[in-house]
Amino acid sequence: MHVLIIGCGYVGERFAKQAVERGWQVTALTRSQKRAEALQLAGIRPVIGNVLEPKSLQALPQADLCLYAVGYDRSANENKRDVYVSGLKNVLSEIADRIPRLIYVSSTSVYGESTGDWVNEETPCEPANESGQICLDAEAVVNEVYARNLNRDATIVRLSGIYGPGRLIGRKEQLRGQKPISGNPDGWLNLIHVDDILQVLFILASGTPSSSLYLLSDERPNRRFEFYSELAKHLQTPAPVMPDEPSADFGKRCDSLRIRNELGVKLLRPTIQDGIPVSIE
């Protein structure tokens, strides 16, 4: 198995290293020479390039699968739509004819639900903000490109809020400093631990999924106050400081029953009570 990874960040790098451990051949796109050297030391073949520079993508190899997990780097001073949509178009125009399978990592921000109702793969997408619309537009690019290519398959995975080791740093500082935490305390949070993201991505990469779209979230949405209270308990800090003003935004609750049923996934961290203790460093 040869996998090409576009977006070797929090999720992509972990996937790459585990793929190497499985004996897979792994190639990853990176923008910097220093990063390329680190990837090479980990057994990953680097290709230096940028999704916004089409000529730099010509060196991307033929592979069995592409995992596309590009995140938005605010420090890069690049437009989010350019990165998510134009960059995706650039990559797919280069690889779609020679890499038969794509796993595209998207976001549950494509749903605009704010009343606390449940959403799943069948729920109409009505993004509430520009970020969600950009993610939805990127999904449309994937569907359009792969609909034109026979014997080519694309799977879109919409992730809820990612957490895990190294992803709770800002939250820890807020709690320890007793700084007010924004958002409706009674609003719903939907989370997925990085261990479960990796588990699902490897299942998708190793088999032939029956659906082209999956939503991935843990088994129990939590009220915002509940999440921060659980985190505070494990950090041994005072209870979270939350705003008192009423809010009409209760968010959404994500139902990931399809992915658990169709792929036979048994989540490693099905609730925050399982995931937070293994995420605190």
Regions found by a protein language model. Give the residues of each.
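Conserved N-terminal Rossmann-fold NAD(P)-binding element of oxidoreductases
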Residues: 3-7
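N-terminal Rossmann-fold NAD(P) dinucleotide-binding loop
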Residues: 12-13
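NAD(P)-cofactor binding segment of oxidoreductase domains
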Residues: 63-103, 140
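Mid/C-terminal beta-alpha module of Rossmann-like enzyme folds, strongest
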Residues: 200-250, 256
